[in-house]
């Protein structure tokens, strides 16, 4: 009964919104192709770049810092107390991981956060918290509300079908791949993510990591932009502010 009431509270997606989203995705695809062609042209005639000694020293320092931090976690695994009312987390990678510990790199890959400012939904469990502690200096995470979940999936929701990345604008695709879990439309998908159940892993795995947008001024003023984004680590319900900022 509780699940049925929660489903009723979620409004349906207007058809005109789906059409707008299709047009938006087509525009972004065209822009991506143009950017790729420009990048290929720029690469022609470029000289090889050599890594400076300072970068090797920097990487060595990052690896040492990670080893010390991970050793402390093993000795004193003080966990974060998570309120019972929260069962869903959204994790965003906000730091570069070049030169970090191999343990951190493998954990980042397992979380599917291969690109900076990419994000994924995770079900909150003791094991999840332990995993997040490993990558804590490189990600930020918290508890998204229904509005944030809905906006992320509607605007940036994608899936990989037959080696092709497609936007989630067709309920037929959702029903074909998730129908066995009782998910037959976009509204069902939003509900299953917002209120994690026994099929959460399979359903969230169907979604591609969300690639969030970065403000244009970030390339010119990286320090200022990172101040706006905030520090890595746990931020509770304040993750919703970051989602609004980057979505």
From Swiss-Prot:
Keywords for the protein's UniProt record, in alphabetical order: Ribonucleoprotein, Ribosomal protein
Alphabetical GO biological process terms: blastocyst formation; maturation of LSU-rRNA from tricistronic rRNA transcript (SSU-rRNA, 5.8S rRNA, LSU-rRNA)
Family label: Belongs to the universal ribosomal protein uL30 family.
Keyword Ribonucleoprotein: yes
Gene field: RPL7L1
NCBIfam families linked: uL30_euk
Organism: Sus scrofa
One Pfam family linked to the record: Ribosomal_L30_N
UniProt-recorded name of the protein: Large ribosomal subunit protein uL30
Source species taxonomy: Eukaryota, Metazoa, Chordata, Craniata, Vertebrata
Any one GO cellular component localisation term in the record: cytosolic large ribosomal subunit
Molecular functions per Gene Ontology: RNA binding; structural constituent of ribosome
Ribosomal protein listed as a keyword: yes
